Amino acid sequence: LTDFQKKINRFDSFTKVRSAVLGQVNWSLVDLIEDKDKRDYTQAFLEDLDETYNHALKILNDFDVVVDRPKPLPYDPNKKYVLPNFELSAIKNCVSPADSFLCIANTVVEVSSVQETSFLDFVQYRHIWQEYFDNGSSWIAPPIPTHDPAQWDGFDYYDWAEPLLDGPSVDPVGNIALIPEGVVLNKRAKLWLERQFPQFDFVTVKGTRGHLDSYFRILKPGLIYSAIPKEQFPDKFKNWDIIFTDKTQYTPPEIVSLFIQDDDYENTTLDVNGFSLDEENFILMRHMWEHHPEVVKQIESHGINCIPLPFDSSRFLNQGITCIINATNRDGKLEDYF
């Protein structure tokens, strides 16, 4: 693919992927952790994650996917990032490029995340999006968030606060874009998206309050791999087939640093968080073969080849495969799949 020009093109999560951004470990962030034992086991988890990246990069290369990587900004204990309503001791680990950036249509959106720790994440990816922009892609952002504490004084007010959204809170499926009921995408964020992308019909998935990629994955038109029942999906999906998996019950690990971990365990089912290379190949966490082989067989019964990815650090980090790989270009177009 030497003649491939990097441009944003994303209307789904299942057609052939041509380019993507793969995360990178910022090793310096372990120095944020004062307790030696916690620092040591966090280091071990990050080493495991680095191996996961190596495996993921090989898979992507095998499928001729053009890959970019962020440039981690080293932690400096003598530096603080002071904003009017909060201050940061570091910049978030750039392990999950999908969290801070939404690729939709021909545009990359630098999102206004609900997490303060993500405020300066864009610095580590600027070289990537500049190249896409120079090649003709659009590059935008919602209003810069203030994270004024008053906005958290009661949930209703937060819901109508400044536009706040995370990248995985939007899942395009042709000419519609699925969104959650709230928390990681509030009402003003929905209005902002509708005005920026009028070609999409933004449709809410009932009972979802977190990143959609940890509730379900659309494997191909007519087929969903899901941890939520079919009745929660919009009526448009009533004739689609569902491969259902129960949410795995486990005790969430201790949060040692929000610059390294995601703490939304309540709204996350990592089992479903896989990545489609195309409609016939799906990357899935390796532990699924050990603990849920029947689910793997169900997916494969639909003509989809499942590719195992070792990801033992996923629970500690609360990150899945679609968190660490952000597809920037797929073959899909603005289609009506319904």
Language model features: what each stretch is:
Residues L1-F338:
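The feature marks the mature, well-folded catalytic cores of soluble enzymes
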